[in-house]
Amino acid sequence: MTQHNHLEHWLAQEREILAALDAGPGPGVATREQIAHLNGLQQMQAMLRGELPYAAIAKTLNFLIVEVDDGKAVFQGTPRPEHLNPVGTVHGGWFATLLDSALGCAVHTRMEPGRGYTTAELGINLVKAITPKVQRVRAEGRVIHSGRQLATAEVRLVGPDGTLYAHATTTCLVFDLPAQSKA
């Protein structure tokens, strides 16, 4: 598949996902009642179908989740002019948030109902600057290990031509979600 074909496929997938997200509840936080009976993969799949809210940060930073599977989450994004640093390349914080989102959601797909996680460590390597010429990038996060207390994952950020822009790893602390109070 050529770079143009990759980009066309990415754009078509993006339009399809955006249509589902726009038809759903929009950005926000799912209620405990909405997700209590769902495992992490089911939650992510429901979000992609527009049945659950998605994270508001995705709208703010112009990226979205485009694919989920067991132990995998793929995000796609396009930095806007307000995401550039003073020298005209994409700010490292944009990279970090996109990478952390793909990593966290990959880990989330392995959570059983009533279990949660938080990022304990995030290591990022920015290997090539993203300039305004880059139309889209994709972050594909994959779980390396998922245990009772810790999970680890890795992610690569690439362009449609396969150019590697960054890679990262995470260690997440896994825990039981607190019971909902009746107050």
Which residue ranges define each predicted feature?
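Terminal targeting signals and extreme-terminal segments of soluble enzymes
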Residues: 1-183
